[in-house]
Structure formats: structure tokens, C-alpha cells
């Protein structure tokens, strides 16, 4: 694979130059992102097995100028969660809406009200993203479906903000179930926590990057990203 080839090149370079003190371990992370391979590696003892004291990683970003490095101390990338909402109503013929419990109308209300978590429930000083990314319902023009499905992602830097989102989602989903007289189920999946850099390691990484690209190509206080990594 491309990643495997890159690791081999780095290994050969480090072996041939050896212009550093100490040891370097090159880690290939399986199941990157979706399955959380980073956490599994730590749980299985990779850091203890090879006596790894610090971990450095590079995240490629296509919109960053070639050769430029961005980093910062503290939280730099957000934590990423997923949510799934199932709206269960009563389907029926589109000509007789009074005989149905329309999940689409309820789903629209839920999606609109979810937007108020950021605009009305959150402290404006706290960073938060709540994005609805999928809505699915129905398969034909003249039938009210029984189900509607809403999926999306939440990005936070703070656990208290994460818990606020969960609380408000539960209230919104429950409230719409009562309002429309149908069933709504929320499944909230906590994903990767925020990426947090220690100040000492940021200094080390920034100095190394300056040796490669020059002082003007390194920003060691770049600002936070709402993207996430495991």
C-alpha cells in the first residue's frame, strides 16, 4: 500500500542517516478513523511494549501550502460523535393523511430544532458543530411512509458541551414524539475524543519542521480544527 511504502522509505532514511539521539518507532495504524485503530493499539499495549514516550503524527491537508506545517499546543482537532434518529409513525395512502402519523413532518421539525442547540443552548464561547448529514424517508409519490431516518455528526472540544448536546437531543426527540403522537428513538455514539497536544511536544515538532521547511513555513499557533482524528 501507499502508506506501507512510505513507512519503508522513512525507516530506510532513519537507518541510513541516524543523526539523532534515542530511538524512533514507526507505527502503522490499522483501521484508521472509522474503527478507531489508534485506541485499539494503545489498549493492546503498543506504547508499553516498545517503551514509547511520545507520539508524533502528520495529518495531510490538501488546502495547506506544500511544505507548510501547522500545529498548536492544547486541543487542536475536535472530538467526533455520531447520532441516529429513527422516527416511527403510521404509514398510509397519501390521499388520506388523517389516517397516518406522518414521520416526515416530525423529522423536519426535529432537524429544524436541532439547529437551536448551537444557536440557543450553547455558550457562544464554546466551539460546537451539529450537522445533519442524512435524511431518508419514503420510496414512492403517493404513500406516506412509516419510518424516517436522520443521521449526523457532532464536533466538540469539551465534555460538558458534549453532554449538553446529548441532553438537548434527548429532549428534542422526546418532545417531537409527544407532539406528533409517534415514536422517536435516538442513538448517540461517542466517537474519538479531541486531539490534545502537549506544549513541550509542539515545540519539538515545530523545531523539526523548521529544519525541513524554514521558520516562515511553520505556524506553531495555527488555531483549532473541527475535523477529527483517532
Identify the role of each PLM range.
Residues 104-230:
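Metal-dependent amide/peptide-bond hydrolase catalytic core
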Residues 5, 14-145, 225-229:
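Histidine/acidic-residue-rich, glycine-tolerant segments that coordinate divalent metal ions
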Residues 10, 77-82, 86, 168-175:
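Contiguous hydrophobic segments
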Residues 2-9:
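Short, small-residue-biased leader/transition segments that mark boundaries at the very start
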Amino acid at each position: 500500500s501507499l502508506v506501507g511504502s512510505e513507512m519503508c522509505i522513512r525507516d530506510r532514511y532513519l537507518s541510513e542517516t541516524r543523526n539523532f539521539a534515542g530511538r524512533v518507532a514507526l507505527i502503522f495504524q490499522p483501521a484508521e478513523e472509522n474503527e478507531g485503530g489508534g485506541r485499539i493499539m494503545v489498549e493492546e499495549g503498543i506504547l508499553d511494549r516498545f517503551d514509547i514516550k511520545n507520539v508524533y503524527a502528520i495529518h495531510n491537508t490538501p488546502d495547506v501550502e506544500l511544505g507548510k506545517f501547522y500545529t498548536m499546543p492544547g486541543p487542536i482537532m475536535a472530538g467526533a460523535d455520531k447520532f441516529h434518529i429513527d422516527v416511527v409513525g403510521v404509514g398510509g395512502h397519501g390521499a388520506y393523511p388523517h389516517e397516518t402519523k406522518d414521520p416526515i413532518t416530525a423529522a423536519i421539525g426535529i432537524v429544524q430544532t436541532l439547529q437551536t442547540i448551537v444557536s440557543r443552548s450553547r455558550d457562544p464561547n464554546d466551539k460546537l458543530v451539529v450537522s445533519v448529514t442524512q435524511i431518508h424517508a419514503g420510496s414512492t409519490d403517493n404513500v406516506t411512509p412509516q419510518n424516517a431516518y436522520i443521521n449526523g455528526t457532532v464536533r466538540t472540544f469539551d465534555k460538558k458541551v458534549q453532554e449538553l448536546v446529548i441532553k438537548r437531543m434527548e429532549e428534542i426527540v422526546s418532545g417531537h414524539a409527544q407532539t406528533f403522537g409517534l415514536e422517536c428513538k435516538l442513538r448517540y455514539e461517542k466517537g474519538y475524543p479531541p486531539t490534545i497536544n502537549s506544549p513541550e511536544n509542539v515545540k519539538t515538532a515545530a523545531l523539526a519542521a523548521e529544519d525541513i521547511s524554514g521558520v516562515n513555513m511553520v505556524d506553531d499557533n495555527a488555531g483549532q480544527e473541527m475535523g477529527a482524528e483517532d
